[in-house]
């Protein structure tokens, strides 16, 4: 027997479900929607963005997607014409970006996060990499920023974000802001600020800086990875470019309706006045507190291990420790014809059953070329 919904759900939850169903064509999740997503759900997301940032948001700027990844692929398809088009990507990097750039035939232009300053983004280094790429005939078209960081777990300082936005404005770059871990902040002295908020705080208007912001229901405290929901918010693009974005989105007809609903709920959760708010807040706070405890436990554990250093956990779901291998391990790796970090990762797997990815898998380089034979990351 199926229980009466009113016996197990709060009144506001039932009311919300009915409101959402009324927005969907055919009042069911099996029909196609508008290619950008159901208008009422985009309205809810726009309202959530406005509430978060303190600046208006427009439902027409929002494209609902099957997770953040399809939005990334869409923009790479739009931005990359041939191998001479480049995208600036942070290293260590989330492999989605290198794979998507390669898939669409472009060139990855790396900029290296500074491990010694807590994985800081140094504008001077980004500019150096940009100028070097341009000197090689690469037309650099966009800058990717992941905040909070994946796989490094840092949270950008607000001042650093202002510098990044100004840099993109001055250099004519599209800013691709991966903000899927915006709820995961563990450091007391850190706070998430969206790049949309930073852009508007600088007084930039709709046509001043092309910005694409990504959000996903796979991350944060919700973790609905298999539901495949998310969105991208596009601002600062001209009408002809927006038309092309819409055309590409229309090729896939629409994202799945269940994911669209979840994306709207993530950005428009229960309010304090709702009956369901107490249980919602308790579950959310419990999950985030658990993630914070585990991040801290790993940070402390790494700091106690010989030959390992690790920056503090600030956000996202990651730590990126550095391992200083002894000379005998370097020699053993060479004898086995393997890179030291890959050799270490395989030995760790064989000895403990623990699976790790060598630092080189994230594009990571050692602190200096002199120490390249001694230092690695996992």
Label each region the model flagged:
Residues 1-36, 40-378:
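PLP-dependent class I/II
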């Amino acid at each position: 027997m199926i229980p009466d919904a009113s016996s197990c759900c709060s009144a506001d939850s039932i009311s919300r479900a009915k409101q959402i169903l009324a927005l969907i064509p055919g009042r069911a999740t099996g029909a196609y929607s508008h290619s950008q997503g159901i208008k009422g759900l985009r309205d809810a997301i726009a309202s959530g963005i406005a509430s978060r940032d303190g600046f208006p948001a427009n439902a027409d700027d929002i494209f609902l997607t099957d997770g953040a990844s399809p939005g990334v692929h869409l923009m790479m398809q739009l931005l990359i014409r041939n191998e001479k088009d480049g995208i600036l990507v942070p290293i260590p990097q989330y492999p989605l970006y290198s794979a998507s750039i390669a898939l669409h035939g472009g060139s990855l232009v790396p900029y290296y996060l500074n491990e010694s300053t807590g994985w800081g983004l140094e504008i001077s280094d980004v500019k150096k990499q940009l100028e070097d790429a341009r000197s090689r005939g690469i037309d650099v078209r966009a800058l990717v920023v992941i905040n909070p960081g994946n796989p490094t777990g840092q949270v950008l300082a607000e001042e650093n974000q202002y510098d990044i936005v100004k840099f993109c404005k001055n250099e004519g770059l599209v800013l691709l802001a991966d903000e899927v871990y915006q709820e995961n902040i563990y450091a007391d002295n850190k706070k998430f600020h969206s790049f949309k908020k930073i852009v508007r705080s600088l007084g930039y208007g709709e046509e001043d800086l092309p910005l694409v912001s990504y959000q996903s229901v796979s991350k944060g405290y919700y973790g609905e990875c298999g539901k495949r929901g998310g969105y991208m918010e596009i601002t600062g693009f001209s009408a002809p470019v927006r038309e092309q974005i819409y055309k590409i989105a229309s090729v896939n007809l629409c994202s799945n309706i269940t994911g669209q609903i979840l994306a709207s709920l993530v950005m428009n959760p229960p309010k304090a006045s709702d009956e369901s708010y107490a249980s919602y807040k308790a579950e959310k706070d419990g999950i985030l507190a658990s993630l914070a405890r585990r991040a801290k436990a790993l940070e402390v554990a790494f700091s106690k291990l010989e030959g390992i250093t690790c920056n503090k956990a600030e956000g996202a779901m990651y730590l990126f420790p550095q391992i200083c291998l002894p000379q005998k391990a370097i020699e053993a790796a060479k004898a086995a014809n393997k890179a030291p970090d890959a050799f270490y990762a395989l030995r760790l797997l064989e000895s403990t059953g623990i699976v790790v990815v060598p630092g080189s898998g994230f594009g990571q380089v050692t602190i200096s070329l002199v120490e390249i034979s001694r230092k690695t990351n996992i």
